[in-house]
Design a protein with these regions (language model features):
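Short active-site segment of divalent metal-dependent hydrolases/proteases
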Residues: 118-126, 235
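Histidine-centered, transition-metal-coordinating active-site segments
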Residues: 1-88, 93-101, 142, 151-157, ...
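A glycine- and small-aliphatic-rich helix-loop capping segment at beta-alpha/alpha-beta transitions
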Residues: 127-142
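Short pre-active-site segment immediately N-terminal to the catalytic Zn-binding motif
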Residues: 99-110
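Short, polar/flexible loop-turn hinges at active-site or ligand-entry regions and domain interfaces
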Residues: 145-147
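Short, conserved acidic/polar surface loops in the N-terminal third of protein domains
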Residues: 126-129, 189-191
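Active-site alpha-helix of zinc metalloproteases
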Residues: 114-115
């Protein structure tokens, strides 16, 4: 009988040679596939076709939570406007920019793609504002229970999703790149730190929960991770300005008219990529010229003043989302403790056959702290789901009635 699916020894030898050629073509500073470290050492199915980091990307893409990128805020919420960037598009931009840099430097593009596509999986609804509000709830909830105060950060939660909630068995290189991706602070040079072990990685992860400043000290453990970290900033620096215009907020766009790196998104991206390459070819670190670094730092600083910290843009988050998130956290935690099996924390989360099983022991008893469960559930929500569950639970109908979305034809009415 003809074998349709299994490779012959000759075919396997060819595929193995392809994989070895891939590693041989990499820069000496790249992360070769042969050095990938996976906690569960079992080789993935079809490992000869899907090398370690290629397999990581598949695990991320097929993660049940990956779809939710599509309705998670990048910067602008409360707009019925499909031209505004959502988290799903942002991670694709990061991946493309990082792979452009990585290709020229002969880095491992498969590792770059895995880190880039998975780096924001732990983001909450309503972007960084939602992240800070959920952290408030988590701190208050753990402290109220007599536990050490714990903090929420989206990069740490991305790792928790892959390690604890859905147990994707990603490589240590991918996980460390995701954990250390936060690029809110511009650096002129990005150099990787030693990789370490999974035990050391877990200690680092726990320290991030307990010390609110510790995550700022993290550095990626591969040059590929460094590229993704810088590409994250490149991807949003100009794009967030572009979205400001697309949101009809031209009156707020008070930016410098001329910059060394450009003022249009396409110029910012292109110029930064070129300068990084000029300074990083045959280097063990990722670098920029001092003048370019300073201009990027100033541009991002302008974004904070004009966009991220604008009082009018932030008002709906602080006036509506923040109190709703605190109310939702308290309600779901109370439902858990009362074992109210009709609550969405059970029906929509813990009863899920995939993610729910990792909160229980062999006898199906819940063994996870309620604060962790509620934090995980809220972090997994999209913007729309968050509003819908608040309405469903009638958390504050008066507050919800104040919520306004900018519609497509508002300017024509």
């Amino acid at each position: 009988m003809k074998n349709y699916f299994d490779f012959t020894p000759e075919e396997e030898a060819y595929l193995q040679e392809v994989n070895e050629d891939f590693d041989r073509a990499l820069s000496p500073y790249a992360a070769p596939n042969r050095e990938a470290v996976r906690e569960n050492g079992t080789l993935p199915r079809n490992a000869i076709v899907r090398p370690p980091y290629f397999y990581d990307t598949d695990c991320i893409l097929h993660n049940p939570l990956y779809n939710r990128y599509a309705d998670k805020t990048q910067v602008f919420s409360f707009y019925r406007n499909d031209d505004l960037t959502r988290r799903a598009l942002h991670v694709q931009f990061v991946s493309k920019i990082a792979r452009t840099i990585g290709r020229a430097l002969r880095l491992n593009l498969e590792l770059i793609e895995a880190i880039a596509l998975g780096h924001d999986m732990g983001h909450t609804p309503f972007g960084h504002k939602g992240e800070s509000f959920l952290s408030e709830c988590y701190q208050e909830g753990t402290a109220a229970d007599g536990l050490p105060k714990r903090y929420f950060f989206h990069n740490v939660h991305s790792v928790r999703i892959f390690r604890c909630i859905l147990r994707s068995n990603l490589t240590l290189q991918t996980l460390s790149g995701i954990l250390a991706h936060n690029g809110e602070k511009v650096c002129r040079e990005y150099a990787p730190s030693p990789l370490g072990t999974f035990e050391e990685f877990d200690r680092t992860l726990e320290q991030c929960y307990l010390d609110p400043d510790f995550h700022k000290t993290l550095r990626p453990n591969t040059l590929e991770g460094c590229v993704v970290r810088l590409s994250d900033m490149i991807a949003y620096a100009g794009k967030d300005r572009q979205d400001l215009y697309r949101a009809g907020l031209i009156s707020k766009a008070k930016f410098e008219e001329k910059r060394l790196i450009g003022t249009k998104n396409r110029d910012i991206v292109s110029n930064l990529i070129n300068n990084i390459l000029k300074n990083s070819i045959r280097s063990s670190s990722i670098n920029m010229d001092e003048e370019v670094f300073e201009d990027l730092r100033d541009l991002v600083g302008e974004n904070y003043k004009v966009i991220y910290e604008d009082e009018d843009l932030n008002r709906p988050y602080f006036d509506i989302v923040r109190p709703l998130m605190h109310k939702l956290y308290a309600r779901l935690k109370a439902d858990l403790q009362a074992r109210d099996f009709s609550s969405p924390v059970f029906t929509h989360y813990l009863n899920d056959r995939i993610q729910g099983r990792n909160y229980r022991d062999a006898d199906r008893r819940i063994i996870t702290d309620p604060n962790d469960i509620v934090t995980d559930f809220i972090a997994s929500m999209t913007d729309d789901y968050f509003i819908d569950i608040c309405r469903h639970l009638h958390l504050d109908d008066e507050l919800l009635s104040q919520l306004r979305y900018r519609e497509y034809f508002d300017d024509e009415n």
